[in-house]
Amino acid sequence: HVIKGIEKARKNNIPDLVIDFIRTHHGTSMVQYFYQSFLKNFPEEIVDEEDFKYPGPIPFSKETAVLMMADSVEASSRSLSKPTQESLNNLVDSTIDRQIEQQQFINCDITFKDISSIKKIFKKMLMSIYHVRVEYPRA
């Protein structure tokens, strides 16, 4: 949908700055669902992981990095059948940590302090969206 989004944006005279957000919001990350599905359905096949990656480029600013994180976290959160505080926290951490592992933010002027703050905000937002109550320890 990245390429079609760029085409649609250009057709509608959207500024290049906005198109850059469309272009970078998946970076060069792997489309895990299709990759895992392929491995499951064709276990004997030799697979080139590059065939299951978005073309990029990777985010180049804090803002494009935040969009990438938000898009991935939001999409992943829809897969949770019964969101809990723990599952939402784990989802935010694992999603963003995977992006860091894949070096999606190496061209951004973003710090680990920034990323930690962003994670906290996303966790709070998801708790609110899914109406999850804070789990207090039992006395």
List where the protein language model places each region.
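Terminal helices and disordered tails flanking the catalytic cores of nucleotide-processing hydrolases
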Residues: 2-7, 13-139
